[in-house]
A protein has these predicted regions:
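Hot-dog-fold acyl-thioester-processing enzymes
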Residues: 1-103, 163, 167-168, 176-241
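HotDog/MaoC-like acyl-thioester-processing domains
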Residues: 1-26, 33-37, 82-84, 102-187, ...
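Hydrophobic residues on conserved beta-strands that form the core of alpha/beta folds
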Residues: 44, 151, 246-248
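Catalytic-pocket segment enriched in acidic/His residues
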Residues: 213-264, 268-270, 278-283, 287-289
């Protein structure tokens, strides 16, 4: 594999030019047979945290006031400008608007000093061909004072391919087998402005999350909640059960969460962390499954 193309910014770039290129670009929805991935690495050398922005995120995801430190999934939204730049570089082979978020792993490695700047790095080098399409991994990391404090791997999916099935089976977080006793439950009210509120905080204005009309253009009957909002909301619901230390959060996204609707967040305290699920109010359909463990 060739060395990565490296692009460096002093600070996080504006997303406006990237959005224009996403909307006007002519990339395919899946990579053609024989596509060779050229790695790319982007960095923002100075990312400054905003107390007001953190508070807005906490409000959108209903993070309780008693939860200490940065919400575990917050730094994902600050990386959105670099994610957008990554999607439009020539090295990335497919159209971002057709991608589906399959899995996410976050590792919270050290407390973040909200008064000190961070260095942000985003990296892409992997495409896997599976039975149903193509999977792409994006690695995001933050350093503070030379120490990696937060890491994330997001796995995205592009439907359809005629190429060889090279992808290995990935570990699956199945529906929880925990008993109904000992479970903490929380009814989540997903209001009709949830998509817009999260978009304004995250900068991710994907049309499928905003209105029923724009979502229908991409095959959805209603707007659907952003997967990272669902994750952040469930982590907020389970905040009292999550250790305030080094943790790893493994999430699998299942069925879409329609806007507006209700959902049920369920949390089981287990040795070294918590198991969390988000499902329909009847409990018969799973929206996401999550495992939080200490490192």
């Amino acid at each position: 594999m060739s060395p990565p193309t490296k692009i460096s910014y002093a600070r996080r770039p504006s997303m406006v030019p990237a959005y224009a290129r996403v909307l006007l670009g002519r990339k395919p929805y899946s990579a053609p047979d024989g596509t060779v991935i050229e790695p790319v690495e982007l960095e923002a050398r100075k990312v400054v945290l905003s107390t007001s922005h953190i508070q807005r995120y906490r409000e959108v995801c209903a993070v309780p006031a008693s939860a200490q430190g940065l919400p575990p999934a917050y730094l994902h939204v600050l990386a959105m400008p670099l994610h957008m730049q990554l999607f439009v570089v020539k090295n990335f082979p497919v159209k971002v608007l057709g991608l589906i978020h399959l899995r996410n792993t976050i590792r919270v490695l050290a407390p973040v000093d909200e008064r000190a700047p961070l260095k942000l790095r985003v990296y892409f080098e992997t495409m896997r061909v599976t039975d149903y399409g193509q999977e792409y991994d994006f690695t995001t990391s933050y350093e503070q004072s030379g120490t990696v404090v937060w890491e994330e791997v997001s796995t995205m999916f592009a439907r359809g391919t005629s190429g060889p099935k090279e992808g290995s089976k990935r570990p699956v977080i199945e529906r929880s087998g925990h008993p109904e006793t000992g479970v903490a439950t929380d009814t989540l009210e997903i209001a009709d402005n949830t998509g817009w509120r999260y978009a304004r905080v995250s900068g991710d204005f994907n049309p499928i999350h905003l209105t029923a009309r724009t979502a229908q253009m991409f095959g959805f009957k209603q707007a659907v909640a952003h997967g990272m909002w669902s994750m952040g909301r469930c982590l907020a619901s389970a905040a009292l059960h999550i250790p305030n230390m080094k943790i790893q959060i493994d999430t699998q996204f299942k069925l879409p969460v329609y806007i507006p609707s209700q959902a049920l967040a369920r949390t089981w305290s287990v040795a070294g962390g918590a198991d969390i699920s988000m499902c329909t109010m009847k409990g018969d359909r799973l929206h996401l499954a999550m495992q939080v463990r200490t490192l």
